[in-house]
Amino acid sequence: MSTATALPPRRGRDFIARHGETVFNRIGRIQGDQVELHTPLTRRGFAQAEAIGEALSARMGESPALTLWSSPTGRALQTLAVIAEHLDLDWHATRQDVRLIELGFGSWGGETLTALTARHGPVVHPHGMAVGAPDGETYPAMAARLAAWLSDTHDHDGDRLIVMHGLSSRVLRGLMLGLPDDPYCGVPVAERLPQGSIVMIADGAESLIHRGMGAAAA
């Protein structure tokens, strides 16, 4: 899988954010890649998005030259709308790409972690990455679509903000940082971060911009 990451660092900084807490997150229910399943942010989720916006605004000022990217899920777009308002950027200019969505969980989508654990045993690896559903997307398949997005957008110069999900953002960051394959998932996986966190990747190195206060597993 690591051969898919053989790209030099992109010309520009990448700010990668994990969306805020949703009503499904709050009760431990799996969301996955179902774009049509709109699970809105909670008040805590909106506060997390506000905190990201404040952190970026303090760092970059008003109306920075920043291309907006997002997973097409409602929870990612809601989070980005709040951040964009802090930066005085046009949310309607957001570039949505389905390749940025969360891992697909097949028939597990919409199920609670408690119910799945009762039927199948532990469904979260020790480092926070979920166990893939039998009829769901595999981690190598997710890594392949994320690597394709990286390749297709590699020549886009300038800074960009990407709002996405817990599992998919960890794999995207792992690919960008050239990390070794994770023994549980078989693909590069970066450090886990709480919901409402944002990092910056520049010249192949990652730095934390804001650590969120979320508590979701990934």
Per-region residue spans from a language model:
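Active-site signature of alpha/beta-hydrolase-fold catalytic machinery across serine-
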Residues: 82, 171-175
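Conserved histidine-centered catalytic loops in small-molecule metabolism enzymes
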Residues: 60-98, 119-123, 200-218
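Phosphate-handling substructures
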Residues: 24, 39-40, 85-145
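Generic beta-sheet signal
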Residues: 14, 66, 156-166
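Short active-site segment of divalent metal-dependent hydrolases/proteases
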Residues: 22, 168-169
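Acidic, low-complexity terminal tails and accessory targeting/binding regions
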Residues: 2-13, 58, 89, 101-114, ...
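Short, well-ordered beta-to-alpha junction loops that form the rim of enzyme active sites
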Residues: 70-74, 99, 146, 163-167
